[in-house]
From Swiss-Prot:
GO cellular component: cytosol
Enzymatic class: isomerase
Task of the protein: Catalyzes the interconversion of beta-pyran and beta-furan forms of D-ribose.
E.C. designation(s): 5.4.99.62
Keyword hit for ATP-binding: no
Keywords, sorted A to Z: Carbohydrate metabolism, Cytoplasm, Isomerase
Subunit structure and binding partners: Homodecamer.
Protein name as annotated: D-ribose pyranase
PANTHER family: D-RIBOSE PYRANASE
Family stated for the protein in its record: Belongs to the RbsD / FucU family. RbsD subfamily.
Organism: Shewanella halifaxensis (strain HAW-EB4)
Gene Ontology MF annotations: D-ribose pyranase activity; intramolecular lyase activity; monosaccharide binding
Residues annotated as binding substrate: D28, H106, Y128, A129, N130
Length: 139
């Protein structure tokens, strides 16, 4: 059994096979997921698992270098947006790296998921609680 925080087999495999600049989305329960993109569906019920809990595990398991968010996220769901920024800031401090943060329209965000290696669906029911992480390198 894996003694690290990430126990999901599909997510572990994804982390192990990511390359530099590959993108992975973590989304709320309602984001449309393109049929051609790998879906890792963690959603059990409304709010379980949460978006932030899933982000925390992802950041502990995978090196990132960039973040893409929908512009609408900060306006419509400011508490969840701020919680995400806190996690990103903590990861920057822990790694000594600075990540780019890009804001795009929600429509552009949905289109960008077509290029993701995978979309990880949570049970989150907060509007626009979605993020795309661009993979970095550990060296």
């Amino acid at each position: 059994m894996n003694k690290h925080a990430l126990l999901n087999a599909d997510m572990n495999y994804l982390v192990a096979t990511l390359g530099h600049t590959d993108e992975v989305a973590i989304c709320d329960a309602g984001l449309p997921i393109p049929a051609a993109v790998q879906r890792i569906d963690l959603a059990l019920t409304h709010g379980v698992p949460s978006f932030i809990a899933t982000v925390k595990i992802w950041l502990a398991s995978s090196q990132i270098e960039g973040v893409v968010l929908a512009q609408e996220f900060a306006d419509v769901s400011p508490e969840c947006h701020q919680a995400l920024l806190v996690e990103i800031e903590a990861e920057q401090l822990a790694t000594g790296r600075t990540f780019s943060i890009e804001y795009v329209s929600h429509e552009a965000f949905k289109q960008r998921t077509h290029n993701s290696r995978a979309v990880i669906r949570t049970g989150e029911c907060t509007p626009y609680a979605n993020v795309i992480f661009k993979t970095g390198v550990v060296f």
